[in-house]
Amino acid sequence: MKRRLRAVAVAAAAMLLAVSLGACSSSTSPPGPSGSGTGATISTLTAGETAGYANLDPDQTQSCNDNFCGLFMEHLLQLGPNNTLEPELATSVSEPDSTTYIYHLRHGVKFWDGHEMTSADVVYSLDYQRSPKSDITVYFTNVKTITADGPYTVVVKLKQPDAGWKYTPSYEGVIFEKSFAEAHQGTMGNPGVLIQATGPWQLTSYDSTRSMELTANPHWWGGKVPIQHITVKYFSTETSMALAMRSGEIDLAFPSNGKTFEAAAGTGATLSSWSPPSIYFVSMNVKAAPFDDVHVRRAVAYALNRTDLIAANGGALTATPQSTLIPPSQLQTLGTQTEVNAVLNGLPQYPFDLAKAKQELAQSKYPHGFTAKTEIDNFGNDVEVIQAIAAELQKIGINVQISQVSSAQWSKDFTNGNLGGIAYTAFYAASPDPSIFPSYLLGNASTYNMSRYAPSSINTLMESGLADSAPAQRLADYGQLLKNVATDLPYVVLFAGHNYTELSTKYTLPPFSVYPAFSSWALHLKEKAS
């Protein structure tokens, strides 16, 4: 899992969103590509992963944000191809006004213990994950109330109109059993306790240092589950995981370094890539010297050569150049290609130019350069990229001292804002809405504002970008926001990355259109026809 943090016009009165499979059917499996293959039941699938959460409490795992969580945890909705919302535990959604969403639940859904899921479970689950102690509470800040209206209806009322909210139940707010959670307060999700959910596979054991075991859920609302048993083995490094793939010990993996993994995994597996919206970037703390000087930040922007940094990341197969905090593909949900290009062409640009970088530094309070510290962990090619960044900044007199730490330490320091005045990382977005990356990185309400950049103008633009219903006005809001960010440069976006799947040649699996964490992707895995 890369540092993947998740984060539509307001409907007319009583509009029904197109998220039903036809009436309120409760027996049809989730939509999605079927792929090619035999269609025969698979006895056991063995997958690999390099890190597991200490436990599976949704409050401590970004709502179970893991490549395999979608196999056993479900949401109200799911995001399908072309960013279409599709049913999962809710069959449809109605909007009687701009701040009210009514979710009509699927009837007959059972938890693994056989108890029926009702609105009480959904309300409890969502309230649990929007509590102040939750690590995803930021995604529910605009929620006023969540209430039940009968056993199969849940009403969410927002504090104000929010154009991005409609996607939220497809990537946040996994649903679990209320009675189980209440009986295991403080221990739910721990190994030996686990959780009660509704997904097609039942979680039967979990040890974050060894493995996760899943078995087919006989109660699943979607019908017969095609794989009887799934084992996820945890490895200390991607190298050891690749060697396990080569030997046939595992059948599937989601490597962070696809190019290197493919070479080590051998010819018995095939690598595929998929590219959800992402930004790989340098952040600078605008509230602390020396990065509180805008000329320093502009010097950094001019000094970084995206071609070199993509090469350090593994080359063109791993990334494509990008320079804006909101990817163009997300802006295109609000306007035509011509309209989006007009917005992007109007932004301040910082192409690689050492002469301009030196000129900007000369105008700063640090004309002779300075030393800054940063941290990095050994994830993917992050070490190689931060070393390349340091080498390029050294050319203009900025000495970046790099401390390599464990992933656990990096995550702790990231959460506490202790990575240093300058840092490199990447965020992936689960929502196609252009509000998602600003909500991660900008303004007073952001949990992940590494730069501490929160001028009142940005807060206002973020609020209006969500409150405005007309796509053209939202595009104007986000265009102005991008212009402000490009002028002040709290972040320098370098490129967009790719995600990878390595799959044994024994199997077929359709391309991913959304994150594995938010879909029951293994439903579509099949044995390859001979």
Residue ranges and their predicted role:
Residues L16, L21, S36-G37, D207, ...:
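Detector for C-terminal structural segments
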Residues G48-D97, D127, Q196:
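N-terminal lobe/hinge region of extracytoplasmic solute-binding protein
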Residues S94, I102, V138-E182, S205:
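Surface-exposed binding/hinge segments that line
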Residues T118-S125, P151-K157, G199-P200, I227-H229, ...:
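Alpha-helical secondary-structure segments
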Residues S170-K224, H229:
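Gly/Pro-rich hinge or "lid" segments in bacterial periplasmic/extracellular proteins
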Residues S208, L354, K358-A429, A445:
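Ligand/substrate-recognition segments at binding pockets and active sites
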Residues N217-A263:
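Ligand-site clamp/hinge motif
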Residues T320-E360, N381-D382:
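Structural transition elements
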